[in-house]
Amino acid sequence: MLKEPSVRLREAIIEGNLLIVKRLLRRNPDLLTNIDSENGWSSLHYASYHGRYLICVYLIQLGHDKHELIKTFKGNTCVHLALMKGHEQTLHLLLQQFPRFINHRGENGRAPIHIACMNDYYQCLSLLIGVGADLWVMDTNGDTPLHVCLEYGSISCMKMLLNEGEVSLDDNVRDKGNWKPIDVAQTFEVGNIYSKVLKEVKKKGPPLGAGKKPSSFRTPILNAKATFEDGPSPVLSMNSPYSLYSNNSPLPVLPRRISTHTTSGNGGNRRSSITNPVFNPRKPTLSTDSFSSSSNSSSRLRVNSINVKTPVGVSPKKELVSESVRHSATPTSPHNNIALINRYLLPNKSNDNVRGDSQTATINDDGGGGNGGDATIGMGLRKDPDDENENKYKIKVNNGEPRRRVSLLNIPISKLRNSNNTRAED
């Protein structure tokens, strides 16, 4: 048999099922508070006690406890119930929404700070101190939070209260039974720890800002301190929202000759520009293409500034051809043949018109007519017709003039007629 919506809503809050809670409250908006008849707990009380943070947010958005203060039958609020289990995140949310509950007294006249000291929840105590909780508030027996710490053996909360300075200024406060805090210590060990910590605190003196309470809902900002003492750190301590940069850093200074901006190179690659040239070897790749390159290539030949000497006894033509063949058949690497080719190809830096025509290593021979038997090499080499030795060539550089292409349109018509007549006679 299906249970009542109020019971299902209460069970969904305890289990932390936010979807069912939304569905039930959407269908039954009058069940927002849903007071339990056994203990007087509302929906927000159950969510706070079990630490259901998201459900607390949803209930507060719907207006839970907006117009009236809802207490349990024992007089506890949602802040008291959240502190009973030490739910720090839920406590922070409730203190933001209900700041009037900070010093509100519940069961046996205990304030939320008493509940934190009873269970030694020092994280929650630190949050209460930061928002301005009263450190001298008394319950129905006249016990202060320090009395409660020694009575229940909460060492961490006791040290935190003594280090606040305000409590250590007057440690002889008495309750209604005329008992001092040391008199209600749970064990002798707890009493000895209390005496030792109190002596150390009094020896150091009260800390800066002792006796002053925060005037608003803000965590007090302590002195900024870097996490790493040797130098600046991108990670700061929890209590230091701001940190100054330290000049005593052991890290080396970035060299000024290296610019950190990037420039786009050929082919879309991005590289950092460095003042001094640095050679980066490329991965060896076998080139199966000929020495001639396409005229549509975006890269241009540049003159190599390295002075290369031609070996004695070797003609420039043979050296050039052999080096070019070896360059095209072997893995590409920065060696002297590139400097030699650049030296013979482009001695003039301003010559930008020389493209694929000047890079072709083929010999164009006109065959003995027209040009007087001169054989022109595409790279600026001219063959001497008077010398039959192939090892002797004269180097002639094209000074910015593009090489003339050989075409049938360039041959005079008279030569064509003479050749036809000669064939007819034969």
Curated annotation (Swiss-Prot):
| Localization of this protein | Cell membrane; Vacuole membrane
Where are the compositionally biased (Low complexity) regions?
A: 285-302
Residues bearing Phosphoserine?
Answer: 315, 350
Query: Which spans does this entry mark as compositional bias, Gly residues?
Result: 366-375
Q: Where is the composition biased (Basic and acidic residues)?
A: 381-392
A single Gene Ontology CC annotation of this entry is: plasma membrane
What function does the entry list?
Answer: Component of TORC2, which regulates cell cycle-dependent polarization of the actin-cytoskeleton and cell wall integrity. TORC2 controls polarity of the actin cytoskeleton, which is required for orienting the secretory pathway toward discrete growth sites, via the RHO1/PKC1/MAPK cell integrity pathway.
Q: How does it assemble?
A: The target of rapamycin complex 2 (TORC2) is composed of at least AVO1, AVO2, BIT61, LST8, TOR2 and TSC11. TORC2 forms a homodimer. Contrary to TORC1, TORC2 does not bind to and is not sensitive to FKBP-rapamycin. AVO2 is peripherally associated to AVO1 and TSC11.
Q: Which PANTHER family match?
A: ANKYRIN REPEAT AND PROTEIN KINASE DOMAIN-CONTAINING PROTEIN, ANKYRIN REPEAT-CONTAINING PROTEIN-RELATED
What is the protein name stated in its UniProt record?
A: Target of rapamycin complex 2 subunit AVO2
Q: What is the lineage of its organism?
A: Eukaryota, Fungi, Dikarya, Ascomycota, Saccharomycotina
- The gene for this chain is AVO2
